[in-house]
Amino acid sequence: MAQFYYKRNVNAPYRDRIPLRIVRAESELSPSEKAYLNAVEKGDYASVKKSLEEAEIYFKININCIDPLGRTALLIAIENENLELIELLLSFNVYVGDALLHAIRKEVVGAVELLLNHKKPSGEKQVPPILLDKQFSEFTPDITPIILAAHTNNYEIIKLLVQKGVSVPRPHEVRCNCVECVSSSDVDSLRHSRSRLNIYKALASPSLIALSSEDPFLTAFQLSWELQELSKVENEFKSEYEELSRQCKQFAKDLLDQTRSSRELEIILNYRDDNSLLEEQSGNDLARLKLAIKYRQKEFVAQPNCQQLLASRWYDEFPGWRRRHWAVKMVTCFIVGLLFPVFSVCYLIAPKSPLGLFIRKPFIKFICHTASYLTFLFLLLLASQHIDRSDLNRQGPPPTIVEWMILPWVLGFIWGEIKQMWDGGLQDYIHDWWNLMDFVMNSLYLATISLKIVAFVKYSALNPRESWDMWHPTLVAEALFAIANIFSSLRLISLFTANSHLGPLQISLGRMLLDILKFLFIYCLVLLAFANGLNQLYFYYEETKGLSCKGIRCEKQNNAFSTLFETLQSLFWSIFGLINLYVTNVKAQHEFTEFVGATMFGTYNVISLVVLLNMLIAMMNNSYQLIADHADIEWKFARTKLWMSYFEEGGTLPTPFNVIPSPKSLWYLIKWIWTHLCKKKMRRKPESFGTIGRRAADNLRRHHQYQEVMRNLVKRYVAAMIRDAKTEEGLTEENFKELKQDISSFRFEVLGLLRGSKLSTVQSAQGTKESSNSADSDEKSDNEGSSKDKKKNFSLFDLTTLIHPRSAAIAAERHTISNGSALVVQEPPREKQRKVNFVTDIRHFGLFHRRSKQHAAAEQNANQIFSVSEGVARQQAEGPLERSIQLESRTLASRGDLNIPGLSEQCILVDHRERNTDSLGVQVSKRVCSFKSEKVVVEDTVPIIPKEKKHAKEEDSSADYDANLTDTITHEDYVTTRL
C-alpha cells in the first residue's frame, strides 16, 4: 500500500490524488465494430445486415467481436429478444457459444427454438477458434441446457429440449464410494457438491416432473424424501436442500388441487404402483395416501380435497354429523360408548350381522376403542384408592378384584401392539412415538405383574412395612405400577388429535418435548461439570457423627456436596430454590474454601437459571410459533394418521375383547397350521386363464384410468402455472426495456421504408420529366417569370401526398356531373398509356396558390369521392385508370391557361382560408375535378407569403424541392404550379 501515498511538497494541493488506470484492459473495438454492435443494440436490421454483408466481402469487422461487457452481437440480440436479428445473425454463421444457455436464462422461447434448429457450419464456413475472441463463460461446465431450463422452470423451453432427446445425469448417493465420485471429490470437492446440487435443482423442477414423469406424485414423494435426507447429511447446503424438498411437496399438493370430482380423487388416492398386473389389487385401500403419510407429505395429506374424501369415509354412517348440535353429538357418543360390549359380542358371534358390520365403521370403531380405554383408566383410579385392601402389611398380597379386572386390559394392549408390529413392520412401528410410549407402559405393567407373582409366591408373612427391605418385590412392583399409571393417563392425549381445538395444542406439546431433550443435553453437561467441582471441594468435610438425618431432604440440610450423587441432587433442586446457602459452610475456619464453594454454587445458579432456563423458554416459544403458523396442516396430518389407523381391516374389537379368539380367527389359525405345519401340504389349485385374464384386465384398466386422470391434471396444472406467472409478473424493468427495443426497431424499419419510398419517387419523377417536356413547353415559356416568384418550401408531407381511388372497378362505368353538364373523359390510346409513366406524387398534378379572397361554390353530387392520404402508393393495380386521369388533368389545365372555354366545367376550386394573427397564415384550397364518374379532391397546404418577402423566400428554397421540375401557369385569380 506504500505506492498509494506520496510525499507532499509545497506546491501540492490540499489533498493528494491517487492515479487510477485500468489494470485488466481489454482489446479496443474498431469504429466499425462499435457501430455494428450499436446497431444490434438498437435493433437496426438494415444496418446490421449491411455490416454482415460487408464483413463477408471486405473483412472489415469481426462479426464475433465482444463489447466491454463480454457480449457478442448474438447475446445482445438475445437479451433484447429481437428474433429477427437473431435469425439474421445465425444465417451469417456467427459464433454461437453459450448463446443457448443465455436464451434459456432469459426465457426467450423463440430464440431457443431458433438456436436448437440452427445447424453449426462445417468445413470452410466454420470459424477457427484462434480467430474468435475468448468469451468469459458465465456457466459452470456441469450446467447443461436442460438443467438450466429446469432451474428457470419454463415449461415451453423444457418441452423443446425434451423433444430433442436430452437427458439429465443421475446423481449418486452422498456416501457413494465409486471411482467416479471419489476421483471427482478428490480433484474438486466444491465443484462435486455444487454439481450434485444443480442436478437436484433440475430434478425438483415442477415443470420437468410434470412433463417427463409417468407418475408425478410418486416422483415428487420420493424426491422430497431424498432431499430431506440429504439436508441432514450435507449441512453446508442444508437450506437449499430443504427448500427443494418443500418445492416438491408443494408441487404434489398443487397437482392434487386440480382434481375436479370425487372419481378423479379416488383414482389418485387408491392407485397402487408396486403390484404387477397379475397380482390381485384392492381398489379402495387408499394406497397412495398411505404412501404420502409414509413420506411425510403434510401438504398433500392436508389438501382440502383429500380431507373431504377422508371425512366422508370417516362419518360413513352419520352423513349429517357435522351439522348436528353438540349436545346431540355427545349423547350419541355416550350411548355408543356404553354399548361397546354388546357390539363386540355381536361381532365375535356373527361378524357379518348388521351390528357386526356396524362396529367395523371407522367412526364407531373409534368411539368403542375410546370407551374401552376410559374404562381402563377408571379401573386404575379404583385400584389407587385401595377400596378392597384389608391388610396393608402383608409382604405378598394376593391380587384384588380390581387388579384382576385390569389384567385383561393389559393383555389386550400387549396383543394389540404385537399385531400392529406384525402388520406394519418393526421400522414403521418404532417411528411412531406413541408406540414407544405404549411399549414402555406395557413393559411396566408386565414387570409389575411379574414382581407381584414373585412376592405372592415367596413372601407370605405379615411384617410391618417399616421393616421391609428397600428392594422388596412388592415395593418395586408398587413403584412400577405408579409410573405405569402416569403413562396410561398421558396416553389419553393422543386422542386429542381428533378434536380441532385440542389437536394443535397436543402437536405443539410434542414438538416442545424435542426442545426439552435438546436442552437437557446441555444442562446435564453443565450439571455434571459443577457437581464434579463441588464434590471435589467438599468431599473432605463430610459429617457423619451426631446426625439423625443426613442429606438435603432433612429439616436442616447437611452434607449437600459430600458425594457425587448427593451433589447432583443438590444442584438440581437448587433450580427451584429448595437449597439453602448455608450448605456451603464448613465447621473448620476455612473461609477461602467457603468463598470458593459459594462462588461456584452461585455461578451454577446464574448459568442454569438465567441462561439455560431462558434459552429453554425461547426454544419452546419458537417451536410453538412454528406449529401455530402451520397449525392447520400439522393438525390435519396428525388427524389423518389417526383416521387411517381405524380405516384398516384389522383391530376391530376393542380391548379386552380382542384377546378372545373369534370363530374367524380360529378358522384362519387352523388353516395356517394345516398349510405350513402338516407334512402333507396342500397344493395350491392353479388358477384358470380366464381368472388371470380378468384380473390383468382390471389392473390394466385401473392403470389406464390413472394415466388419463394424470394427463388431465398435468394439463390443468401447467395452464394454471402459466396463468399465475403472468398475473404475478406485473410491470417490471424488463418490460420497459423490451418496449424501448421494439420502438427502436420500428423506428429503423420506418426510416428504411421512407428511404426506399423517396428513392422510388425521385426515379419516377425523372422518367416522367422526359415524356412531359413536349406537352408543357408552352406553359413553361409563358409563365417563366411568375413561376420564380411563386417558389415555396414544401415539406415531406406535401411532396408525398397521394391520391388513392376507393373504387377503381366502378369508376370506369360512371360519369361525373359538374356545373349542370355531363362530360365524358375518354381514355387515351393504349399506345400512349404505355409511354406515360404514372406519377404517384402530387407534384405532377399542380399546386394552387390563392391570389384573391373570392370563394367558389362547389356543387355536391352523390358520386364517389377520392381520398387523400400519405403512405405507400396502392395504385399499381389501378394504373391504367389513374394514368388517364393524370393526362386529362394536364389537358384541362392547358386549356384553362389558354382561356379556352369549358375549363370551369371541368374544375371547381373550393377555397378555405384560415388565418393566425401571431404567425403566417395557412391557406387550404381544394380543387374538385370531374373526370368520368369520379370526383377528385386535392388538398394543398401552402403558407401565405407577403409580396415583400417573396424574393427572400426564393433564396431559401428547400433542397427537397427540385426547381427544374416546376413551372407556373397564371389563370384568372389562381396560380397553377406544375411539378
Swiss-Prot record:
Cellular component GO terms, alphabetical: cation channel complex; plasma membrane
Basic and acidic residues: bias regions: 777-788
Assembly mode: Homotetramer. Heterotetramer with TRPC1 and/or TRPC5. Forms a heteromeric ion channel with TRPC1, with a 1:3 TRPC1:TRPC4 stoichiometry. Interacts with TRPC4AP. Isoform alpha but not isoform beta interacts with ITPR1, ITPR2 and ITPR3. Interacts with NHERF1. Interacts with MX1 and RNF24. Interacts (via CIRB domain) with SESTD1 (via the spectrin 1 repeat) and SPTBN5 (via C-terminus). Interacts with CDH5 and CTNNB1. Interacts (via protein 4.1-binding domain) with EPB41L2. Interacts with PLSCR1.
Molecular function GO labels: inositol 1,4,5 trisphosphate binding; store-operated calcium channel activity
Disulfide links within the chain: C549-C554
Biased composition (Polar residues): 762-775
PANTHER family per the UniProt record, alphabetical: SHORT TRANSIENT RECEPTOR POTENTIAL CHANNEL 4, TRANSIENT RECEPTOR POTENTIAL CHANNEL
UniProt-listed SUPFAM superfamilies: Ankyrin repeat
Keywords linked to the UniProt accession: ANK repeat, Calcium, Calcium channel, Calcium transport, Cell membrane, Coiled coil, Disulfide bond, Ion channel, Ion transport, Membrane, Metal-binding, Phosphoprotein, Repeat, Transmembrane, Transmembrane helix, Transport, Zinc
Location of the region described as Interaction with ITPR1, ITPR2 and ITPR3 in the Swiss-Prot/TrEMBL record: 615-979
Renumbered ranges of ANK repeats: 29-60, 71-93, 96-118, 141-165
GO biological process: calcium ion transmembrane transport; regulation of cytosolic calcium ion concentration
Extracellular side: 384-403, 454-475, 535-599
Domain of life, source organism: Eukaryota
Coiled coil: 223-260
Region described as Disordered: 762-790
Binding site for Ca(2+): E417, Q420, N435, D438
Function, as annotated: Forms a receptor-activated non-selective calcium permeant cation channel. Acts as a cell-cell contact-dependent endothelial calcium entry channel. Forms a homomeric ion channel or a heteromeric ion channel with TRPC1; the heteromeric ion channel has reduced calcium permeability compared to the homomeric channel. Also permeable to monovalent ions including sodium, lithium and cesium ions.
Protein known as: Short transient receptor potential channel 4
Residues that, per the record, bind Zn(2+): H172, C176, C178, C181
Compartment(s): Cell membrane
Record entry for activity regulation: May be operated by a phosphatidylinositol second messenger system activated by receptor tyrosine kinases or G-protein coupled receptors. May be activated by intracellular calcium store depletion.
Gene giving rise to this polypeptide: TRPC4
Transmembrane segments: 363-383, 404-418, 433-453, 476-498, 512-534, 600-620
Tissue: Expressed in adrenal gland. Lower expression in heart and retina. Also expressed in testis.
Chain ranges inside the bilayer that never cross it: 325-359
Residue ranges annotated as Cytoplasmic topological domain: 1-324, 360-362, 419-432, 499-511, 621-979
